[in-house]
Amino acid sequence: DEAFLDVTNPKIPIKYATTIAKFIKRDILMETGLNSSAGVSYNKFLAKLASDYNKPNGFTVIRQEDAQEFLDKLPIEKFFGIGKVTSKTMKRMGIKNGYDLRQLSLYELEKIFKSKGYQYYNFARGIDNRPVEPYRERKSVGSEITLDHNYRLDEEEVVDILDELCLDVSNRIKYLNKLGKTVTLKIKFEDFTQITRSTSLNSGISSHEDIRTNIYNLLRNIDDNNLQIRLLGVTLSNLIDVEETYHNITLFEYMQSKD
C-alpha cells in the first residue's frame, strides 16, 4: 500500500516535511515490524519517484533546486507513468533518460504519444500540478503477502494463508461499512508470472466465510503448470455501502430476515 500526504497548507518548510515522513516510517516499523520507503518533494510525481528510489527501506528527498539534475540522470524506465512498452519505444528512439526526454518538444511528444505526450513533457521538467485527493472513494479492499518461501498450489499452507487474507479483507471492509460484489484471487508464481481470477456476485458480501468460499472456488480452477507460488492476494471490489442494501430489499425479504 502507498499514500500521498500533502503538508503544504499551511506552508511547511521541507525540513519539517522530512521529519513527518521519518515519524511515519518509525510508526510503521513499531506497529507492524515492517520496513517502508518514503519520498519527500514538492509535487506528487517527484514524491513518488523519491519513495521508489531506495526501496524497500529508503528515504529520499528531492528539493526543487535539485529536481532537474535528478530527472536528467534518471533512467527512462524509472519514470513513474512510463511503462515497459513505452520505455522500450523510447529507447528505440534514443531516449534513455530524463535528459534525452527533455530534448523533445511538446509537439514531437504529442505527435508520437498522443495525449500522454503532454504528461511526459511536464514530467521531464519536474512539473506536476495534480492535487492530493484525500477523500477519494475507495474502489477496492485487498490483502496480499509475499511468501517466506515458495509453496505448491496443493499444499495445506496455501489454504491457511488464503484464509488469513480473507479474514483481513473481511475485517477491513466491515470497518469501512462496505460490501463487495466482485471477489478476486491473485497468484504470482516462482517465475514471476502472475494471474488473477475473479467472480462477480449478485449481492455484496463482507463476511469472512463468504469471501473464503468464493476464493476457494476460484482456487480450484487454477492451473499452476507445475510452478510453485511466491505471492497470494485477495481483493473485494465493486464496493457498495451497507446502507444501499436496505433501500433495495423487498418487504418479503425484510419479513424473512425477521424470522
Model regions and ranges:
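Short, internal active-site loops enriched in acidic
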Residues: 9-11, 42-47, 188-192, 237-242
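Nucleic-acid-contacting surfaces of polymerase cores and analogous helical-repeat interfaces
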Residues: 2-147
